[in-house]
From Swiss-Prot:
Belongs to the aspartate/glutamate racemases family. This is Glutamate racemase. It comes from Carnobacterium sp. (strain St2). Signal peptide: none annotated. Provides the (R)-glutamate required for cell wall biosynthesis. The gene is murI. Substrate binds at D10, S11, Y42, G43, N74, T75, T185, H186. It holds the Pfam family Asp_Glu_race.
Length: 268
């Protein structure tokens, strides 16, 4: 069981920000990743459809005999985590709770912002989660529907990205926030531009990076972590429902992997 892979699922390439952190924190762990790029973005889709797509990716990875599932997508976490967690025998974790905890810890003024897809913002999951831990927190949420397409089209460091981010985040500039949750795993690829737009006084919380710390704790708790003496090379397998070339271009740059192999799959 210990040598089995951890499964990661996302609507596209966004979950690679979580995988990057997993490779840093858990270098001996094998990783299977599915990005449903063909049906990305999930944000504008109905919740039941997002749940269906999330289950399709989950079943694909269960066939690979994974030992743990990370829903590395905020929209999918909001729509499907509860259901999947209830029905699977392996540990399952989403990205909303770890991000909320980290934001509460980071804020000094109790003014927390959340940016995410329409689906994540509409679900109100971050606000509910934060208020369940800290009733005094003031939470301001903003949907950023143009951000995911920027990342998926490999435009995340372009002049267009700077313009779109500045325009989209304008409503947050006068909210007095000191902490902002990047409530979509695609958004860390836009992090330098987001930080530059809001200024250094705002602490950015990467929900994906926070999630990996919890993954590590869960692996230890259930005695599922690969032994540190294990000399076998960790596997890294990537699957996409969209263009494997585009996925490869973004993944190899972001993860700094020379031998990255991407397989095209069909779901549903």
């Amino acid at each position: 069981m210990k040598k089995q892979a951890i499964g990661f699922i996302d609507s596209g390439v966004g979950g690679l920000t979580v995988v990057k952190e997993a490779m840093r924190q858990l270098p001996n762990e094998s990783i299977y990743y599915v990005g449903d790029t063909a049906r990305c973005p999930y944000g504008p889709r109905p919740e039941d459809q997002v749940r269906k797509f999330t289950w399709e990716m989950t079943h694909f990875l269960l066939d690979k005999n994974i030992k743990m599932l990370v829903i590395a997508c905020n929209t999918a976490t909001a729509a499907a985590l509860k259901d999947i967690k209830k029905k699977l025998a392996i540990p399952v974790i989403g990205v909303i709770l770890p991000g909320s905890r980290a934001a509460i810890k980071a804020t000094h003024t109790n003014r927390i912002g959340v940016i995410g897809t329409e689906g994540t913002v509409k679900s109100n999951q971050y606000k509910k989660m934060i208020h369940s831990k800290d009733t005094k927190a003031l939470v301001t949420s903003l949907a950023c529907p143009k951000f995911v397409p920027l990342v998926e089209s490999n435009e995340y460091s372009s002049a267009i990205a700077k313009k779109v981010v500045a325009e989209t985040l304008r409503p947050l500039k006068n909210e007095g926030l000191d902490t902002l949750i990047l409530g979509c795993t695609h958004y860390p690829l836009l992090r330098p531009i987001i930080q530059n737009t809001l200024g250094d006084s705002v602490t950015l919380i990467d929900s994906g990076a926070e999630t990996v710390s919890e993954v590590s704790t869960i692996l230890d708790y259930f005695n599922l972590a690969v032994d540190s003496q294990n000399k076998e090379k960790a596997e890294r397998n990537f699957y996409t429902t969209g263009s494997s070339q585009m996925f490869h271009a973004i993944a190899s740059e972001w993860l700094q992997l020379d031998d990255l192999a991407v397989e095209h799959i069909t779901l549903g």
